[in-house]
Amino acid sequence: MIFTTRDLDILRFLRWCRFVLAKDLTGVFSKGEVQNLEILRLIKLYLPAQAYTLTASGTRLLEAAFPKLPAAVAPAYKAADTIRRIRQAKVMTTTYQAGVPVFTTDVSALCEQAMFLPMIARNRGSNPWGSTRVAALLHTGDLMCASHWVSPGIGCVALTDELTAFQNHTASIPAKQRAIIFAASSYEEILGELDAVQEEQNTRLQSYREVYDCLKLPLFLLPCNGTGCLQLRILGVPNYRELLARIILKSHYVPPPADRTMYDAMYQGAPFVMAADMNLRRIDAAVETACSDGLSQIVLAALPEQAETVLNRRYRETGKARVFTITESALRELLGSTAPYAPPDLPFYTLEGSVLDVPPLKAP
């Protein structure tokens, strides 16, 4: 058996994340590919979590294939650590399927136009970010984003420390706009935390709801699924709001007033807002501004899951907006293809130009 680039990417996911849920791994790669590596004892299933992890043989193969890897750390099997790693993997697999390189080890890699740095791999095992809760950094399109996992019961965060570390460690990287991403398995999970009744805090820590309310940076909600993958691809297109608005509205497109930056266009006299990035605070600002302008409704355009699970309930059913779904043809016009990224099923070649096969694994 000659190992493919896909096989090596599976192993790299487990080196970077330590644990990846079986259903998440087989959602990106085929069951056959995962099972082959398990049969070869390069990976194993940790039954209590139903998550895969690397074996010693898998580690040796990776180290033969790649000269630079994040420091190998033995998996910790405490429930809290395992859950944290699994959540990290969900963000990472979603970003990978959006076509963003994810196997990075330090902040300097983020100088590339599109790059993702999971915090588990930052600076080869050291932690210059202190006790911050950022899960990953993402440079895509015009944005430099800090991603946080936000789900019910996630706890509190020291916002000042987070923003200071974010700015200090990315200051040398050119990006037009800093932003924050709240990620979870679904939009419902994120909103379950943001909409929950918050206990009053007497410390410098803040709940994620308080962060949501006071943060000045753009803030996007991101599910770790196919919709999240499409959302990340849209975010990666410079000037995506205007481009999508023009694609959707065609000859009906009218530029928004210069002093109405929360609008993306005017459509039949109503403010048009591109909601595919799930910046709900921007939508709320558009609703409030439209009301002050004497307009009863705005128009939203979003991906189907976004409309069905969030926007219809919050805006259409309350009479604040008309909600339209973005068509497949409009997305193809913007992105070229809506299919998730898949690595080529080709033999993996080392820097020396040789392939990797099973026999070297027999060596002690």
Where are these regions (language model features)?
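Long, low-complexity interaction regions most often at the N-terminus
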Residues: 91, 125-137, 174-178, 198-200, ...
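Accessory beta->alpha helical hairpin/"wing" motif in late/C-terminal subdomains of nucleic-acid enzymes
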Residues: 44-69
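Exposed, interaction-prone assembly regions rather than primary DNA-binding/catalytic cores
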Residues: 76-174
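Non-catalytic C-terminal interaction segments of nucleic acid-processing enzymes
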Residues: 2-4, 22, 195-364
